[in-house]
Each structure stands twice: as structure tokens, then as C-alpha cells.
Design a protein with these regions (language model features):
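S-adenosyl-L-methionine-dependent methyltransferase catalytic module, highlighting the catalytic core
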Residues: 181-195, 199-307
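Residues lining the SAM
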Residues: 174-177, 203
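Acidic-residue sensor for enzyme active/binding pockets
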Residues: 144, 178, 261
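Conserved N-terminal segment of class I S-adenosyl-L-methionine
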Residues: 1-174, 185-187, 286-290, 295-303, ...
Length: 307
């Protein structure tokens, strides 16, 4: 892992930080070292939240190769006993959730897209390509780091080199940028793959849970350091914190914030600034409910066009 100080969206170095930990699962599975302290930062300029700890390309490859497969599930369940087989297998595979996400996507882009002009569609980081609306485009492609088998009618792009040689009329990146250590670099790559006048649709979780009980000072840092030396206590506090965050949308007293797969927490302002900085202009945006299990989940959808 490496650390950053500047906001990945607006590049400001003015921020407020709270102590957090690198999740035990992430530390052992991807980083291959014991969990450690990090910080959750909130940019004072654009209100973007992000962890200062970022994954290297090698760590990303370890995390997403065989994503949600047997080894992934076993290691994550070891450190997060509440992460069940039902949750693991249901992510991206629940027909109701897929329908909700596709409907949210169509609600955003249909008023702005001439389907007759959309030939090639890319779902970047799109698992099996199951979220590509059937009505959109003729040639459908998915670029995915995991080993997921594409849906019928969806063509898998096998490498960065192949992707960079192609052009598309519509690109989707749903549930991607929250995972990225360098989101601006990803958007710059996608910009180079778009035909002139084409559209990019971004969706990210809209996660703005309360962090008031996560401390900034030495006392809270010492508390987290003590937890790191007692794995059973760390797992217990992690469970307590996750339950409060999911049910109450707040980190509880003596709870903790952990750096997990989501490194970034966008709102409309920060996403707009990031898109404009990387050569896009925002066309439309919406916040939509996209899942109801194990709790209500909202996503921020933004449609952007090349400037």
C-alpha cells in the first residue's frame, strides 16, 4: 500500500482526518501483511471522502483475481463472520437487484441517448456484463479483472492493450471508481476509448455515513492500536461497527472505520469536479435506490459527455 495526501478529485491538500484501520481481510488477502492504522480524510474543498491508504497494482490484482470465489470467500468469512455465503453469491447475481440497477441506468440515459447512433457499448469493470441494458447498442463488451464468464451476447476484452485499441459509443462504469486508487487515471483511460460526442455513465455507492465517533487524536489512535494487537477484540468491534453503520448509518461510540474494498466516497460535487478535471461535462445525475438487502443501498448515477 501507499499513502496520498492530496484529494484525488480536486487535488487540494486541505482536509480533515479521522483515524481508521486497514481491514484485516484486505490486509491479509491483498496486501499480505497484518492490518495497520490509516486515515479517512474529507476534503475541505469538495467534501470528497477517501482513505489515505491506497492499493498498488499488484495488490489490486491479488484482490480481484478470483473475486468472490472460494478462496476470497473463505478468507473474508474468516475475518468477517457476518459475511455470509448468501451475501457473497448474491452480489451481482440477484435478479431483483440487477433489474433495479438496469432501470436506474435507463432512467438516467434514455432522455439523452439516440439508440440508433449507439453501436459499441463497453461495461468497464462490469463483472459478466449483466447490467448492460438489452436495448442499448449492437456490439456489447465487458472489461473485467476477475475471471467472471460473460453473459451470452457480451464479448470479453482480455487485456488493457486490447481495450486501449478500441473505441466505443457508450461506456458504463458501475461500481468501479469507489475501488480505484487513482480514479482520475481510470477516467482518462475511458476518455481515450470514447468516440467524439459519446457518453460515459458512472455509478458509485452513495455512502455518507456519520463518522463523528471516529476520533482524530492520540487517545483514539491508541485505542485502535490496542485492538490491532488482539484479533478477537478487533473482529468484535468491527462487527459492532458494521451493524451500526448498516442499520443506523453511523459509526457507533468506540466503533471503528475500516479501509476495505471501497477507498473512495463520492458525492455529486466531488464527482462533478473529478469528471470536469478529466475532460468531461456532466449531462445529468440522480441518486437511486439499487438494493434493499441487507439494507437499503443508494447509488449516485452521473451521465457525462466528452468536452
Amino acid at each position: 500500500m501507499y499513502t496520498v495526501e492530496a484529494c484525488p478529485c480536486c487535488q487540494s491538500k486541505k482536509s480533515q482526518g479521522r483515524w481508521a484501520i486497514v481491514a484485516p481481510f484486505l490486509a491479509h488477502y491483498a496486501v499480505e501483511r497484518p492490518p495497520s492504522l490509516c486515515k479517512l480524510l474529507e476534503c475541505s474543498v469538495c467534501s470528497f471522502r477517501f482513505f489515505d491508504a491506497r492499493l498498488t497494482p499488484e495488490e489490486v490484482a491479488r484482490l480481484y483475481s478470483g473475486y468472490r470465489g472460494e478462496r476470497y470467500f473463505a478468507e473474508r468469512h474468516r475475518w468477517e463472520f457476518w459475511y455470509s455465503r448468501q451475501v457473497n453469491d448474491g452480489i451481482g447475481g440477484d435478479p431483483e437487484e440487477i433489474a433495479l440497477r438496469v432501470a436506474a441506468l435507463e432512467k438516467l440515459f434514455l432522455p439523452h441517448v439516440n439508440n440508433g447512433k449507439v453501436k459499441a457499448v463497453l461495461d468497464y469493470g462490469g463483472d459478466r456484463g449483466q447490467f448492460i441494458p438489452k436495448s442499448l447498442g449492437i456490439d456489447k463488451f465487458v472489461f473485467e479483472l476477475s475471471d467472471a464468464e460473460p453473459e451470452p451476447g457480451v464479448n470479453r476484452i482480455g487485456s488493457e492493450q486490447e481495450l486501449n485499441s478500441m473505441k466505443f459509443d457508450f461506456i458504463m462504469a458501475l461500481g468501479v471508481l469507489e475501488h480505484c486508487s487513482e480514479p482520475a487515471s481510470v477516467l482518462e483511460q475511458l476518455r481515450s476509448c470514447l468516440n467524439p460526442g459519446s457518453l460515459l455513465c458512472i455509478a458509485v455507492p452513495y455512502e455518507r455515513y456519520g463518522v463523528g465517533f471516529a476520533g482524530k487524536g492520540r487517545l483514539y489512535r491508541s485505542y485502535l492500536n490496542a485492538l490491532l494487537h488482539f484479533p478477537a477484540a478487533l473482529v468484535a468491534v468491527d462487527f459492532y461497527s458494521a451493524a451500526a453503520r448498516i442499520r443506523l448509518n453511523h459509526i457507533p461510540p468506540l466503533g471503528l472505520v475500516k479501509c476495505h474494498e471501497h477507498l473512495n466516497f463520492f458525492n455529486n460535487t466531488s464527482m462533478t469536479i473529478l469528471l470536469e478535471r478529466t475532460g468531461f461535462e456532466v449531462v445529468d445525475s440522480k441518486i437511486e435506490c439499487v438494493a434493499k438487502y441487507p439494507a437499503r443501498v443508494e447509488s449516485l448515477y452521473i451521465l457525462a459527455r466528452l468536452r
